[in-house]
Amino acid sequence: MAMIGVMEDSKLHEDMENDMLGDLTSRAREALALFISISLRDNTELNLVVPNGPSWLSHVDKKDLYLNDETLKKITDILVAKDVTGNYNIVNVAIAAAPQHSQKRFVIYIKTSIYVEIVVIGNMKSNLTLIADGQDSTIITFNLSSSNSKRTFNTATFASNGDGFIRVDMCFRNTTWPVKGPVVTLRVNGDMSIIYRCRVEEYQDALYPHKNRQCYREYFLMDTVDFICGNAAAVFQFCQIVHMDG
């Protein structure tokens, strides 16, 4: 009986390893397929927004993204600013004003400032672009943690669930670190999401590319441990991942 038990345990362990290997292989294939779809042939276009972007970008989006960011700012639909120049002074309010299930690109420009809020983009907010003034200029920050009776998944300072989401030139922070355990700063769920020239600062589990197709380009991540976790088919181009002292 003891020998049978050992054999059964061994078979169970082998099955678990095979299942895990199959899952990892499947994810690797998805990531490789996405990587192949992104052309890097022409490095002279690095100053453009997501040059030679993923094949799943629409023709209209590719045309818009070949504009430089200053041109994009001039075609915004909503302006967020802490002074009187903006349509709104709260990022969440501006996002709420964006149309649901939009078939065309809707652009929100967030001017230089520090915005202390939890930003959540619902799954009905599709084809939304957020563009800002730079990683050191436009900062979205909060201090929610798992010690606030929240699952780590729900601690994100910024969470986007809508498909076709694009964000450019901003910084995201979760300032609970290091005293309150693992938290998330940026969580991305929506399919065909692009994060370009953005910065994330965190202590643990900073970036959560949860699922679907995602592309990160010229992205800066500062963390101490468990930098990136998630199940997305995500590609990282020209990114920096920096370890900071805990």
Swiss-Prot record:
Gene Ontology molecular function: pectinesterase activity
Cross-referenced InterPro entries: Pectin_lyas_fold, Pectin_lyase_fold/virulence, Pectinesterase_cat
Binding-site residues for substrate, renumbered to this chain: T152
Glycosylation site positions: N127, N143, N174
SUPFAM superfamilies: Pectin lyase-like
One Pfam match: Pectinesterase
Active site positions, chain numbering: D205, D226
Keywords: Aspartyl esterase, Glycoprotein, Hydrolase
Pathway(s) per entry: Glycan metabolism; pectin degradation; 2-dehydro-3-deoxy-D-gluconate from pectin: step 1/5
Reactions listed under catalytic activity: [(1->4)-alpha-D-galacturonosyl methyl ester](n) + n H2O = [(1->4)-alpha-D-galacturonosyl](n) + n methanol + n H(+)
GO biological process, any: pectin catabolic process
Site residues (Transition state stabilizer), renumbered to this chain: Q204
EC assignment: 3.1.1.11
Keyword Aminoacyl-tRNA synthetase attached: no
Family: Belongs to the pectinesterase family.
Biological role stated in the UniProt entry: Acts in the modification of cell walls via demethylesterification of cell wall pectin.
Protein name: Putative pectinesterase 57
Organism: Arabidopsis thaliana
Gene designation: PME57
